[in-house]
Amino acid sequence: MSFDLIIKNGTVILENEARVVDIAVKGGKIAAIGQDLGDAKEVMDASGLVVSPGMVDAHTHISEPGRSHWEGYETGTRAAAKGGITTMIEMPLNQLPATVDRASIELKFDAAKGKLTIDAAQLGGLVSYNIDRLHELDEVGVVGFKCFVATCGDRGIDNDFRDVNDWQFFKGAQKLGELGQPVLVHCENALICDALGEEAKREGRVTAHDYVASRPVFTEVEAIRRVLYLAKVAGCRLHVCHISSPEGVEEVTRARQEGQDVTCESCPHYFVLDTDQFEEIGTLAKCSPPIRDLENQKGMWEKLFNGEIDCLVSDHSPCPPEMKAGNIMEAWGGIAGLQNCMDVMFDEAVQKRGMSLPMFGKLMATNAADIFGLQQKGRIALGKDADFVFIQPNSSYVLTNDDLEYRHKVSPYVGRTIGARITKTILRGDVIYDIEQGFPVAPKGQFILKHQQ
C-alpha cells in the first residue's frame, strides 16, 4: 500500500510505551505503525524528536462572538496549533451571548467558519436561566455542560453567563444525568470568596498574596464536597475543573474510591508558578482558583504523579490589556496560556521530574479525549485521526511577546526559559504549524459533535 505520509525515526508516544517506530497516514487517519512500512507521497524524518498525540485541551475560552476583542477563533486556534494542540473543547463563556441554547451555539458555529486552525468540540452552559433548554444543546452535539458555583458573569449584560445556586445545580444535574451528559463545575464557595474579597478591598489589601488569601483552599474543598454529593444524588457524571489544591484532589479521589463517576483536571500554572511569582508577574497571573504557595504546588505535583489528576488543560481565558490594569483585586482574572501548555509541561514534568512519556501523553491528550467521548482523538493508534505534535527535547528558548499568536500578545510565561520546543503540529495528516514555515495551510479545523462520534 502507498500512504500519504510516513513519519520515520521519532520516539513515538503510544498508549502504554514510547519507542522509536514509524507511523503511516492515509486519508487523515493512522493507517500503520511499525517498521519498513513501504512508500508514501511524503516522508518526514523525526529523528531526535518525540512524537506525541496532539494535545486535547479540554478547557479553553475563545470569546467569539461578542467579545472577539478579547480573543477569537483565528488567533486563538493559531496559538493552539503553535503550542501542539490539535483539539480544543471550548467553554460556553466568555462569548456573548453565552452558549446556553440552540440559537447561541449556532452563532458560535457561524462565527468560526473558515477560522479554525485546529478541531474543536463545544460545551454547553448550565446557568440559572436555561434549565428547561438543556436538551437543545444536547441535540446539537455538545460534549458536556459547564457551570459555576462561584460567582460569575456581568450582571449588567442580560445574555452573559450566570452561576447557579445549589437548587439550580441539582435540578440541572438531574436533567444532564438523564441525557447522559457530564457536568463540569468551577468549584469555589461563592458567598465566602465574595465576602473575603470585598473585605480585603475595603481594607486596602490588594496584593497578590491578599488575593490568594481571599480565595483560600477550604473554599475550593467545600465546593468540591458539595457538588460531589449533589451530583451523586442527582445521578450525573461530574468533572471538576481546574483543581488548584491537593486537598481538592483528595476529595475527588475519595469519591472515586467509593464508586462515584467523577474526573478532574488541573492547569500548568498551578504546577510552575507560585504566589511569590504571582506577586512579581502581577495581574497577568491572576486567575481563579488562584495560584497558591510553593508547599501547595509540591502537593499538586505529588497528586499528578500519583495519577489522581486525569488531565491537564490550559484554561486559556485572555482579555484586553486594559482589563488587567490596576491592582490585582480589581483586575480581570484569567490567564493566557494555551500556546505553552505542552512545551512547559514537557520541560517541567518529563525533563525535570522524570515523568514517563506514556503518562505525559495520557495527561495531555488521551484522558481528555476519553472523558469527553472524542473517539477519534487523543492517541496514536490504528484508525485514529492522524493528529501529532513533534517535540524537540532539551532545546531551550526564552518566550517573548512576539512569539505569541494571541490577539493580545501577553502571557505570564513571557520571559520564561522553556527547555523544549514544539517544532511541528499535524492535524488529520496535514501540517498546520511548522517552526520554520509557520502556518503552511489554510484553516482546516472542524467542529466535533457528540452524535457524530
From Swiss-Prot:
A single cellular component GO annotation: cytoplasm
Cysteine-cysteine disulfides: none
UniProt record, GO biological process: allantoin catabolic process; purine nucleobase catabolic process
MF terms (GO), sorted A to Z: allantoinase activity; cobalt ion binding; zinc ion binding
Pathway: Nitrogen metabolism; (S)-allantoin degradation; allantoate from (S)-allantoin: step 1/1
UniProt EC number: 3.5.2.5
Membrane spanning stretches: none
UniProt modified residues of type N6-carboxylysine: K146
UniProt remark on cofactor binding: Binds 2 Zn(2+) ions per subunit.
Entry keyword set: Hydrolase, Metal-binding, Purine metabolism, Zinc
Reaction catalysed by this enzyme: (S)-allantoin + H2O = allantoate + H(+)
Post-translational modification (record): Carboxylation allows a single lysine to coordinate two zinc ions.
EC class name: hydrolase
Binding positions (Zn(2+) 2): K146, H186, H242
Cofactor(s) listed: Zn(2+)
InterPro entries assigned to the protein according to its UniProt record, in alphabetical order: Allantoinase, Allantoinase_bact, Amidohydro-rel, DHOase/Allantoinase_Hydrolase, Metal-dep_hydrolase_composite, Metal_Hydrolase
Residues noted as binding Zn(2+) 1 in the record, renumbered to the chain: H59, H61, K146, D315
Family to which the UniProt record says this protein belongs: Belongs to the metallo-dependent hydrolases superfamily. Allantoinase family.
NCBIfam families in UniProt: allantoinase, PRK08044.1
Subunit structure: Homotetramer.
UniProt function note: Catalyzes the conversion of allantoin (5-ureidohydantoin) to allantoic acid by hydrolytic cleavage of the five-member hydantoin ring.
Official protein name in the record: Allantoinase
Gene label: allB
